[in-house]
Amino acid sequence: MKSKRGSKPPIKSGKVKAKVIYLTRRPPGKTSGGAARLERDTMGEMEVPADAYYGVQTARAVENFPISSLRVPRAMIRALGLIKWAAARVNTELGFLDPKIAKAIRHAAQEVIDGRLDDQFPVDIFQTGSGTSSNMNTNEVIANRAAELLGGKLGSKLVHPNDHVNMGQSSNDVIPSAIHLAALEQIDKALIPALKRLYTALAAKAKEFDPIVKIGRTHLQDATPIRLGQEFSGYARQIELGIQRVERARPSLGELALGGTAVGTGLNTHPEFALRVISLLARETKCPLREARNHFEAQAAQDALVETSGALKTVAVSLMKIANDLRWLGSGPRCGLAEILLPETQPGSSIMPGKVNPVIAESVMMVSVQVIGNDAAITAGGQAGNFELLVMLPVMAHNLLQSIALLARASENFASRCVEGIAADQERCRASIEQSLAMCTALAPEIGYEAAAQIAKEAYKTGKTVREVALTKKILPESRLNHLLDPWRMTEPGLTGGKPGGAGG
């Protein structure tokens, strides 16, 4: 039977119709039991799940932004809770907030800080560019939980999300401040310690492998000898410099926009509010926080996030180089370079029995790619500020905090599951040295570049070593030749031939 014109043909027996999977949580206004409460805001009434601590503005945001499965990172939820906790205390000290309400707000904010209310933050990352939806999500959760603590009902506004929890604040100064605070905390508590562990592991291997001489490589071609420890010392220095780069970004992150409110002028906030809140936050978090020197810059731009992301990208580039080198050095086990032995962590192939792959290094490389991509997004976001406000804050926050978390976990894992367990194949390293045609470099200062090049070419054609060809040609006494071609001497600064000479590329 033919289908009607314009209609889809019936699905044949045995065919499975694809189902669209939406990466969003349950729609607002419904719970597993279907119970809901009715709330009102300036746009009208809307159903909110009866047991939800969030309110109508959060429900609207969930409905408006069914974009992804990405939610505000835990580190930022914690930072928002810290800001609301400190603001309630300062507003009480300034005489603007009833002490009983303030105490309930601080208790609820502490629960947000501790992660006990994380399931009450359903708003998508791809939302309003100022992050207002996430600020109001925080205000509503804290207000409703505080009202509950005071014996009120959810949605009663016994504690008001705007008038009480958001007092003296605007999304435009709270969200940038929360991003800065979250990034600083994660850098100090997670990233720097992880990078230091990786640096320590690489430095220890540099010392352990220092006696082992091997062939160096440039352009993926054989070059003059190098000690394996010297190679690892280069990796350690890359990480050491990466730590310094990240630490240099910390002062910029330490400037908080709090106190600027809507456009940086500080409208509707007490002159001492920001200073007091930030001082309290600095004391609680041990982070180097201070009020922004210029509130207009702090809200209209986010150059500090771009700067920090640039430092993270540089660390990612370093990790990519190191991880890739270790993959190559450990390639084999029989037909590759195989100069080092990487720890075996899991079977590597579903078809080739006994194969073991450098999976930890590959994981690090993928993290590096992601962080580099995140930096591109943050850079583009940083360009999107118009006049008094940058409106890419949630996506910049997501990418920056993800980069910090990924680099921290990858560095820790790289150190513990790979670098700390690396061993060297000394025989393999030693065997490759004599085979290198680049050994003729040490002869060039004494016999000349062209003569040394001829020896290298003949060695290549005949399959002999540079030493064997030089001995056959009797260009130098054997004792002198042995002195010049001593691999260890070639790994230290010095004039092996008695005068300077080029060392190739």
What do these predicted regions represent?
Residues 2-505:
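Conserved, well-structured ligand/cofactor-binding cores
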